[in-house]
Amino acid sequence: MQHTSSDTLSENSIKLLQITDTHLFASDEGSLLSVKTLQSFQAVVEQVMARHVEFDYLLATGDISQDHSAASYQRFADGIAPLEKACFWLPGNHDYKPNMSSVLPSPQITTPEQVELNAHWQLILLDSQVVGVPHGRLSDQQLLMLEHHLQASPEKNTLILLHHHPLLVGSAWLDQHTLKDAEAFWQIVERFPMVKGIVCGHVHQDMNVMHKGIRVMATPSTCVQFKPKSDDFALDTVSPGWRELTLHANGEITTQVQRLASGSFLPDFTSSGY
């Protein structure tokens, strides 16, 4: 499935806004580790609007829901409506794809494999979900699809989206739940120098590193944050956030993480897991 943006293909840079790991519930009182996830999600959307953040597309990189309910996905769809931008989403390990599909067709949300953003850039969206387990894996079909789109547009700078982290983050408990076939993934992408960036969710923290000449980014959750470099499960004191990216015509990526005010939506630090 290929998606061409409905806007005139711009010759200029593309601005993207990534939100991830919203962990929503059917109930508006649903909480994860004592953080009411609908409220924290809404606070992020409200702050994006209050700051007049300019962006062309919204990226939602999985774990939209915590309870698998159709209502939780509708809450997400309703929540992003004020942003008035097209949203591309993909599943995480907590998502239930039949209920994700229940809100489609949507005026904002689509689930393409590939998006031509403009004359210079494409997105490729991968499904790394393995039903019933927290780690990720790319099926042979997903790997073939990735290779196909890279071969079909060898001149386009490419940003790849998936839920699970394709690089270890240095937290033993989280790195058990990484992308299990990362080697097969990297064997494909490193053959294509136009792959400029990879964006994921899952780890509930900021990561921005270069690997094999490719920028690899993970992004804070809109709710609970995991403490970096912690061997055992641990929560961080930093606030929920989002990522802003600019894809430049020359293939460069500039990006920054933004957060809610310090002290916003603090979790239960006595929790030993979830």
Swiss-Prot record:
InterPro entries registered for this protein in UniProt: Calcineurin-like_PHP_ApaH, cAMP_phosphodiest_CpdA, CNP_phosphodiesterase-III, GpdQ/CpdA-like, Metallo-depent_PP-like
Binding-site residues for Fe cation 1, renumbered to this chain: D21, H23, D63, H204
Keywords of the record: cAMP, Hydrolase, Iron, Metal-binding, Nucleotide-binding
Enzyme class: hydrolase
Phenotypic consequence of gene deletion: Mutants show increased levels of cellular cAMP.
Cofactor binding mode and count: Binds 2 Fe(2+) ions per subunit.
Cofactor(s) needed for function: Fe(2+)
Pfam family, one: Metallophos
Job of this protein: Hydrolyzes cAMP to 5'-AMP. Plays an important regulatory role in modulating the intracellular concentration of cAMP, thereby influencing cAMP-dependent processes.
Protein name: 3',5'-cyclic adenosine monophosphate phosphodiesterase CpdA
Organism: Vibrio vulnificus (strain CMCP6)
